[in-house]
């Protein structure tokens, strides 16, 4: 597998055997139209992906029904025959927005996507009813775990979930100052240690860059890069790439 942090926020590109999956793609400069009241975020580059990369995309995974994960405009600009792997909650939102791509519900049992076995695992409060974590495993046994908000430590421990690479939040964000939306770096380290992950990609960078009405109620705190880097190789920048041996 090859992993690319496809933008400076939380779009992910997973390639294997010359086919690829896009996770939570947002491929425009503005998250919502100018003047949008509730939420807004902007970025200089739409993504770092080339046309060749995009042409390899054979499937989408949408992990949450929120606008910064489920970006309708991006999906509408991609081929409408791309299958979308997601939850029942997101599937309903896709139908509501007249997205006619094939829709497949991911489960803990696992589904093969682009020769990668993909499982949807439980996440943590307050997201457990609307989002899911992803565990990917290729035919060589390489594993990647993705969680865009908060990991479910109890589940990871009980099920002995292991992963070579983790894609996690590390910059604390709290709604109203106490409802945790994104993990702080200490919890990120704990998750990596629990799963045995030696490589870490940061997702959801700089939550303080999310503006609009919701931004007034979210308090954020940056992460300690040096502390993270002691025992874990950290990838946090747009365009960062990791390839497993033999890829």
Give the role of each language-model region:
Residues 19-61, 73, 151-159:
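Pre-active-site segment of Zn-dependent metallo-hydrolases
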Residues 8-10, 28-30, 65-70, 91-94, ...:
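Active-site environment of divalent metal-dependent phosphoester hydrolases
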Residues 23-24, 57-68, 85-88, 144-150, ...:
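Active-site neighborhood of phospho(di)ester-bond hydrolases with catalytic His/Asp-centered motifs
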């Amino acid at each position: 597998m090859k992993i690319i942090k496809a933008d400076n926020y939380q779009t992910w590109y997973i390639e294997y055997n010359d086919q690829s999956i896009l996770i939570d793609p947002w491929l425009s400069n503005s998250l919502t139209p100018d003047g949008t009241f509730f939420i807004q975020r902007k970025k200089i580059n739409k993504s770092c992906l080339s046309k060749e990369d995009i042409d390899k995309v054979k499937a989408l995974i949408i992990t949450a029904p929120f606008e910064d994960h489920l970006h309708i405009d991006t999906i509408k600009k991609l081929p409408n025959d791309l299958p979308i792997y997601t939850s029942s909650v997101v599937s309903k939102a896709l139908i509501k927005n007249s997205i006619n791509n094939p829709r497949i519900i991911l489960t803990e049992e696992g589904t093969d996507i682009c020769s990668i076995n993909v499982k949807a695992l439980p996440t943590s409060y307050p997201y457990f009813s609307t989002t899911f974590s992803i565990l990917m495993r290729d035919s060589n046994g390489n594993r990647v775990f993705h969680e865009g908000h908060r990991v479910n430590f109890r589940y990871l421990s009980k099920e002995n979930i292991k992963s070579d690479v983790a894609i996690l939040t590390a910059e604390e964000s709290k709604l109203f100052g106490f409802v945790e939306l994104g993990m702080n770096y200490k919890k990120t380290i704990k998750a990596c240690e629990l799963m045995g992950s030696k490589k870490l990609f940061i997702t959801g960078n700089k939550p303080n860059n999310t503006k609009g009405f919701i931004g007034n109620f979210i308090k954020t705190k940056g992460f300690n890069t040096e502390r993270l880097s002691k025992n874990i190789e950290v990838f946090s920048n747009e365009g960062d790439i990791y390839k497993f041996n033999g890829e």
